[in-house]
């Protein structure tokens, strides 16, 4: 009798992708980080969407909305901590994925490596926006410190920082 995972149309797709995947026998666990990145990204998107349903960006009520999420929303505290720790796990997996690429010499494939560098910069820019956009003192500090690095650019650095800040300093809510 044949196994259902090899005969059922939907189970067959999953079986061929995960269980009976044709992969070399010498592949190591270092090659799992791309899949782990996908799982972490999916977790971030889902928890971020559910958190955004209850978050308020107004400066007067932002902290209260986070308190509301943690206390009043069913498993809101789990969503918040999964989102926060999922971001850390995402970057751990990302750096290990890049480290594996360096170790195995993937940088020799120039087009692939350059695309990875572009993706790394895009991920870092997205993470910066996710860190700075929600209102709070910590995001003001993050915006000030990280964007102040631009002031090191000769000639245009100070003007660039002032343009990004919209003035002489970071002020008010950044999500409105």
From Swiss-Prot:
Pfam families: Cytochrome_B (PF00033)
Main location: mitochondrion
Function per UniProt: Component of the ubiquinol-cytochrome c reductase complex (complex III or cytochrome b-c1 complex) that is part of the mitochondrial respiratory chain. The b-c1 complex mediates electron transfer from ubiquinol to cytochrome c. Contributes to the generation of a proton gradient across the mitochondrial membrane that is then used for ATP synthesis.
Similarity-based family: Belongs to the cytochrome b family.
GO biological process, one term: mitochondrial electron transport, ubiquinol to cytochrome c
Tree of life domain: Eukaryota
Co-factor remark: Binds 2 heme b groups non-covalently.
Cell compartment(s), UniProt: Mitochondrion inner membrane
Gene Ontology CC annotations of this record: mitochondrial inner membrane
Bilayer disposition of the protein: Multi-pass membrane protein
Annotated InterPro entries: Cyt_b/b6_N (IPR005797), Cytb/b6-like_sf (IPR027387), Cytochrome_b_N_euk/bac (IPR048259), Di-haem_cyt_TM (IPR016174)
Protein keywords: Electron transport, Heme, Iron, Membrane, Metal-binding, Mitochondrion, Mitochondrion inner membrane, Respiratory chain, Transmembrane, Transmembrane helix, Transport, Ubiquinone
Transmembrane segments: 33-53, 77-98, 113-133
Residues at which heme b b562 binds: 83
The species this protein was found in: Nycticeius humeralis
SUPFAM superfamilies in the record: Transmembrane di-heme cytochromes (SSF81342)
Subunit structure as annotated in this protein's UniProt entry: The cytochrome bc1 complex contains 11 subunits: 3 respiratory subunits (MT-CYB, CYC1 and UQCRFS1), 2 core proteins (UQCRC1 and UQCRC2) and 6 low-molecular weight proteins (UQCRH/QCR6, UQCRB/QCR7, UQCRQ/QCR8, UQCR10/QCR9, UQCR11/QCR10 and a cleavage product of UQCRFS1). This cytochrome bc1 complex then forms a dimer.
Known cofactor(s): heme b
Protein's recorded name: Cytochrome b
Positions that bind heme b b566: 97
